[in-house]
Amino acid sequence: MNIRYIKNYLASKVGCHIVVKYYGSRNKRERYEGVVYQAYHNIFTIKLCGGEIKSFSYIDILTKTIQIYI
């Protein structure tokens, strides 16, 4: 898997339901559920159920800081 593949994949999924699991430092884990909102050059955004918008980097997927489920 490479960055180009991830960008193209997420760009094709704009408007689709997504679950993002974030694995931070010190065992901090968060789960976000929403819709793929935009796919930009370096980041992608998701619109959460409450209307909040979160952004993530494609590098986060490669480094396994986040996992996505579509």
What does each model-identified segment do?
Residues 1-31, 47-70:
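Short glycine-rich, low-complexity segments
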Residues 42-46:
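Short aromatic-glycine-enriched beta-strand elements
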